[in-house]
Structures are given as C-alpha cells and as structure tokens.
Curated annotation (Swiss-Prot):
PROSITE patterns, alphabetized: RIBOSOMAL_S21E (PS00996)
Protein name: Small ribosomal subunit protein eS21
Principal place of residence: cytoplasm
Family: Belongs to the eukaryotic ribosomal protein eS21 family.
Modified residues (N-acetylmethionine): M1
Subunit structure comment from the entry: Component of the 40S small ribosomal subunit.
Positions carrying N6-acetyllysine: K81
Intracellular or extracellular location(s): Cytoplasm, Cytosol; Cytoplasm; Rough endoplasmic reticulum
UniProt entry tagged with the keyword Ribosomal protein: yes
Matching Gene3D superfamilies: 3.30.1230.20
UniProt GO molecular function: RNA binding; structural constituent of ribosome
Keyword terms: Acetylation, Cytoplasm, Endoplasmic reticulum, Isopeptide bond, Ribonucleoprotein, Ribosomal protein, Ubl conjugation
One Pfam family of this chain: Ribosomal_S21e
Amino acid sequence: MQNDAGEFVDLYVPRKCSASNRIIGAKDHASIQMNVAEVDKVTGRFNGQFKTYAICGAIRRMGESDDSILRLAKADGIVSKNF
C-alpha cells in the first residue's frame, strides 16, 4: 500500500524469486539473495551500483540455481551473451 506521498507503508514486502517469480516465504531457509557488483569498464573498479538476485529454495533443491543466475546475468548484460 502507498500513502499520499507515494511511499510504501506496508509492514512486510515479500521477496520474489528472480528465476521463477515465486514468492519466497519466511520459512524458506534454503533461499539466497545475492548482490552482483557492477564495475567500470575502463578501470575495473566498483562504481556503487549492483544487481540483486533472489533464488528460492526450490530452484536450489533442483540444482538449477547456477544456470538461473547465469541466465539472469546474461539478460542484465553482466555476462557476455556468448559465454
């Protein structure tokens, strides 16, 4: 819910899995959240920006988390398309 100023005022905003778009429940202790840093192409230094990926426990249990993270990173341009 938003107030008149457009700020979110909900007490709890659930996370969603980046790969499957499932809601990650509070009791899903196998889920992970990963921040991937963006670096400057010239200097190779961290520029203060990052991409956040959340993977639910069901994807990790199936052994598909590495493929899902690679697919998401390719879509965001972090990893080259021909990797």
